Amino acid sequence: MTELKNDRYLRALLKQDVDKTPVWMMRQAGRYLPEYKKVRAQAGDFMSLCRNADLACEVTLQPLRRFDLDAAILFSDILTIPDAMGLGLYFAEGEGPKLKRPITCKKDVDNLIMPDPEGELQYVMNAVRTIRRELKGSVPLIGFAGSPWTLATYMVEGGSSKAFTKIKKMAFCEPQLLHTLLDKLADSVIDYLNAQIAAGAQSVMVFDTWGGVLSPRDYKDFSLQYMTKIVAGLQRSYEGQKIPVTLFTKNGGQWLEAIADTGCDAIGLDWTIDMASAKARVGDRVVLQGNMDPSMLYATPERIRQEVATILASFGKGNGHVFNLGHGIHLDVPPENGKVFVDAVHELSMPYHV
């Protein structure tokens, strides 16, 4: 394999010395970039873009041409697994993801296909292989999947939700059925991420977007225990290289200590938690990723730089920080503000690594 020219991100995840704090942005490839919109139009629809390895590679690389990012992240969607399980993923204009055949009963769970990463999901692995080749060792490639709980919310609700009544009804009225579903999803995520690692992903991330809608007890029962299972099942080294894993629960600040106990290498933080208090709570057990409010990218360059400086000071000196937004970049953010953000992280973090 090609030697990495910039391994700052991987070094930070392994708590090794870096010259400056590494930075990437969740959803860095996407609709805020005019060049992305052109490729998306060329593909016809979102899933056609995901299924075309060359186009998925192109949009993955686009932000790296604009910004001095320390990592690339696979362009895909967390709902590829439910789609491959037979639920029929589609995107309604202006409404987000929908599933044609949501889960309503035990029979639906029993009938789920356990997807083969090199079968139904081979298009994702082809994209990973293509991106890894085209990166030519410039920066590492991050693979990812949704958490079992988050995937289950879409599979039971049939799409996005505000109140999560259907999945919570299942959790509280038929908990064993939900546990059966979550267990199947955990097994599928393990297979999927290990296949991404074999195809070339150098780090992986699990997105638990909706874990934060659960009570503390229910979070541990229905989300955290399945992410713990995933961490235990992942291939943590490949071809002599360690493969770090990051867990991210949006609105998960109250559970940092428990997330650190999963055995993950890093925890993603959203902007609702103070970086200094997060660091004080988990110590040096895990690396912290985050955590600027993505809406800060609407602000002036001066204000963006000020916020970056504040978060860097909050983390303080030393290693173990990957800078990121606290969630995905908004679709109407001016791209030039992304550059201000990335450049500010590199420039202002150098004194913390002397």
UniProtKB/Swiss-Prot annotation:
Keyword Lyase applies: yes
GO-annotated molecular function: uroporphyrinogen decarboxylase activity
Xref: Pfam families: URO-D
Highest taxon in the source lineage: Bacteria
GO biological process assignments: protoporphyrinogen IX biosynthetic process from glutamate
Any single GO CC term annotated in Swiss-Prot or TrEMBL for this entry: cytosol
Reaction(s) catalysed (UniProt annotation): uroporphyrinogen III + 4 H(+) = coproporphyrinogen III + 4 CO2
Alphabetic keyword roster: Cytoplasm, Decarboxylase, Lyase, Porphyrin biosynthesis
Entry-linked CDD domains: URO-D
Annotated positions binding substrate: 27-31, 77, 154, 209, 327
Main location: cytoplasm
SUPFAM superfamilies with a match to the protein in the record: UROD/MetE-like
Cellular localization per UniProt: Cytoplasm
EC number(s) from the headed UniProt entry: 4.1.1.37
Assigned protein family: Belongs to the uroporphyrinogen decarboxylase family.
Protein task: Catalyzes the decarboxylation of four acetate groups of uroporphyrinogen-III to yield coproporphyrinogen-III.
Oligomeric form and interacting partners: Homodimer.
NCBIfam families: hemE
Name of the protein in question: Uroporphyrinogen decarboxylase
Organism from which the protein derives: Psychromonas ingrahamii (strain DSM 17664 / CCUG 51855 / 37)
